[in-house]
Amino acid sequence: MELNSIKPAEGAKHAKRRVGRGIGSGLGKTAGRGHKGQKSRSGGYHKVGFEGGQMPLQRRLPKRGFKSHLLKFNAEVTLSTLEQLGLAEVDLAALKSAGVVGQLAKVVKVIKSGELTKAVKLNGIGATAGAKAAIEAAGGSLA
């Protein structure tokens, strides 16, 4: 067998039905669209989700919750991330330059996730109670 000799199975492919080409074809005149009505017109169809004037599902259901616009300014850093950085002093600028937090971040908080063995001094960065205890246990401090 060769790639240029591969062909589809017999009867697997058929020509597209040409509509609107005379009554002898069986699909002339109305071209399978029936008589009159919105769906028979060119360009005539309803928008997605339209239910014939009934209140559509996406408007029947209530809105729920909200998304805070302040999230992009807040960031969190784990203890394991601080461990990987290997810096003695960590501040917002150091985290941004290392690519740990986004450039828009204004507030950073350390959360207790992972282990910390190196002493790290945090400048202008908050920490949860558990993270603070872990940092101090490793010989670090918060300023």
UniProtKB/Swiss-Prot annotation:
Taxon lineage: Bacteria, Pseudomonadati, Pseudomonadota, Betaproteobacteria, Burkholderiales
MF terms (GO), sorted A to Z: rRNA binding; structural constituent of ribosome
PANTHER family in the cross-refs: 50S RIBOSOMAL PROTEIN L15, LARGE RIBOSOMAL SUBUNIT PROTEIN UL15M
SUPFAM superfamilies in the cross-refs: Ribosomal proteins L15p and L18e
Keywords linked to the UniProt accession: Ribonucleoprotein, Ribosomal protein, RNA-binding, rRNA-binding
Gene Ontology cellular-component terms listed: cytosolic large ribosomal subunit
Coiled coil start-end: none
Xref: InterPro entries: Ribosomal_uL15, Ribosomal_uL15/eL18, Ribosomal_uL15/eL18_sf, Ribosomal_uL15_bac-type
Quaternary structure note: Part of the 50S ribosomal subunit.
Record organism: Paracidovorax citrulli (strain AAC00-1)
Protein name: Large ribosomal subunit protein uL15
Gly residues composition bias: residue spans: 21-31
Source organism, top-level taxon: Bacteria
Known role: Binds to the 23S rRNA.
A Gene Ontology BP annotation from the UniProt entry: translation
Similarity field: Belongs to the universal ribosomal protein uL15 family.
Residue ranges, annotated region (Disordered): 1-54
